A protein has these predicted regions:
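Glycine-rich phosphate/pyrophosphate-binding loop at beta-loop-alpha junctions
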Residues: 149-186, 190-200, 253-256, 261-348, ...
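Well-ordered mid-protein domain cores that form the structural environment of catalytic cofactors
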Residues: 99-156
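Gly/Ser/Thr-rich loops at beta-strand to alpha-helix junctions
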Residues: 108-110, 142-148, 231, 264-271, ...
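Active-site-adjacent helical/loop segments in soluble small-molecule enzymes
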Residues: 209, 217-252, 258-259, 335-413
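Charged, compositionally biased N-terminal leader segments and the immediate start
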Residues: 1-28, 312-314, 323, 332, ...
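Catalytic phosphate/nucleotide-handling subdomain of diverse soluble enzymes
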Residues: 283-302, 403-470
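Small-residue-rich anion-binding loops in enzyme active sites
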Residues: 30-109, 184-219
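Single conserved hydrophobic/aromatic residue that forms the stacking wall/gate
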Residues: 474-485
Length: 486
């Protein structure tokens, strides 16, 4: 059966998976969602014996039904190969009484690699399937990790160009170096004097500019996105939650059918939405625990049903979560509104014009699978420090947010279900914050000296991505947030 996609802001018009991947954002500004989330057509017993690549095919074939088996397997095998520093792609590590799903073993040492390694292949295949002759210009706003992963994925891919916008001073030093040292004739990096929300809003405005689109089309170009608003980013993220459950089963950490909780450090809401889709596909997930940092707009939303971005934007040690407008939440809003596009438009208009909206009591019922929590900067430091002291395991700042929220949830609710924590970035990406949390004395050392020190204390070898930035040249541009980014 051919699974079609529709916009969250117009339920009448449908497109194929490949068309949704190519467009990125719907013409009406909405996000593409499947008409219905498909069920897995293989059992967990079968999945537990599968490799990551085989699991990816089992999941993606249910969503990307207009791809042939040969096309999809080619995309998967081209993505999940030696670019990852472990054959299992996404290892599960038991840390104390939780299970960390390490999603940072790809080329840019962050979870974005899990989807951005395959997106260029999905996009080029989609272009071929739809007889697209234009070059595809990828526009991406980043709060840190997406930028480098997208640049690495699309670098020198024929028929594409990529422009990444990031907030100057709003990403870690390592994240910035990774982006501005990216090689590739078709890559551009622009720093804006503003925050991530400014960058993301600017990119969305470009997508919605019909005159600009027509002008570019006449010159042989068309826009698409590598942000998680693109369904081609979201679906590959579903895979690792299915894979993780199957591996827990294979390792006899859980019984068949046993429910687990999943905690995800959350900013733009894509990663936790992927876990929600995995649950809808049939993975026995009980609670989806949404972990926020001091920018706790999502925590407040789950507590009250009110989404309010009218608040101070706080720069934290987990910059990929420093977001006040969580774009992917719109997909969940559309779902809990009973796929009512008119209601979605009403709420998104309120968000754009007033910065706030409130969902109905009936919609709030649809959030019962979700729990919100947040960690302060001090709690992040304590979690990194205490986990290292007790177990020897070193985690990055974003993962520490999730680990703290997971532990707090267990303490508050006495829920004894096993908990999976999405470990979203290598500690090497946030080396100063991580090392000074372990011991404040490290603050006196320079970043590259800290990298060597982290290797000693963690036992994690220095990743190639970090070795590369030591010997690369920088290239970047800067924009004020009020300047047009077109």
């Amino acid at each position: 059966m051919n699974l079609l996609y529709k916009s969250t802001r117009n339920s009448d018009k449908t497109v194929t998976a490949s068309q949704a991947i190519l467009k990125g954002l719907a013409d009406d500004g909405g996000l593409f969602v499947p008409v219905s989330v498909p069920k897995l057509d293989v059992t967990m017993d079968e999945l537990k014996d599968m490799s990551y690549q085989e699991t990816a095919y089992a999941v993606m074939k249910q969503f990307f039904t207009d791809f042939t088996e040969e096309e999809l397997k080619h995309c998967i095998n081209s993505a999940y190969d030696s670019k990852f520093d472990t054959e299992v792609i996404a290892p599960l590590v038991k840390v104390g009484d939780t299970y960390h799903l390490e999603l940072f073993h790809g080329a840019t040492i962050a979870f974005k690699d899990m989807a951005l390694s395959i997106l260029p292949h999905l996009m080029i295949t989609s272009a071929r399937k739809n007889q697209v002759k234009n070059d595809i210009v990828i526009l991406t706003a980043t709060s840190g990790d997406t930028g480098k992963a997208a640049l690495a994925g699309f670098a020198d891919v024929p028929g594409t160009k990529i422009i990444v916008f990031y907030p100057k001073g709003g990403v870690s030093h390592v994240q910035e170096l990774q982006m501005v040292t990216q090689k590739g004739e078709n890559t551009s990096v622009v720093a804006i004097h503003g925050n991530f929300d400014n960058a993301q809003s600017g990119v969305k405005a470009i997508f919605e500019d019909k005159e600009l689109a027509a002008e570019l089309d006449a010159k042989g170009y068309q826009f698409s996105s590598a942000n998680s608003i693109n369904i081609g980013r979201l679906v590959p993220q579903v895979v690792y939650y299915v894979y993780a459950y199957a591996k827990l089963l294979e390792n006899e950490e859980i019984q068949a059918g046993e429910e687990i909780n999943v905690t995800v450090p959350t900013g733009n809401f894509g990663n936790i939405l992927a876990a929600y889709y995995a649950k809808q596909m049939g993975v026995p997930i009980a609670k989806l625990i949404c972990a926020s940092n001091d920018n706790k707009v999502l925590f407040d939303f789950f507590q009250t049903g009110v989404y309010d971005r009218n608040r101070e934007f706080i720069l934290t040690s987990s910059p990929s979560m420093d977001i006040l407008i969580s774009s992917n939440l719109e997909r969940l809003i559309y779902t809990i509104a009973g796929q009512d596009a008119q209601k979605d438009v009403e709420l998104m208009t309120q968000l754009k014009e007033k910065g706030v909206y409130e969902i109905t009591a009936e919609m709030k019922e649809g959030l019962k699978d979700f729990v919100g929590g947040f960690a302060t900067e001090e709690e992040v430091k304590e979690t990194i420090h205490d986990t290292y002291q007790k177990t020897g395991y070193v985690m990055d700042t974003h993962t520490a947010v999730a680990a703290h929220v997971c532990a707090q949830y267990r303490k508050d609710t006495k829920d004894e279900k096993k908990c999976l924590v999405a470990s979203t970035a290598s500690p090497y990406k946030f080396v100063r914050n991580v090392m000074t949390a372990i011991d404040p004395k490290y603050d006196e050392m320079e970043d590259f000296a800290l990298i060597d020190e982290l290797e000693k204390v963690s036992g994690f070898p220095i990743p190639n991505a970090i070795k590369e930035i030591r010997r690369s040249e920088e290239h970047t541009s800067e924009l004020q947030s009020h300047e047009p980014i077109s």
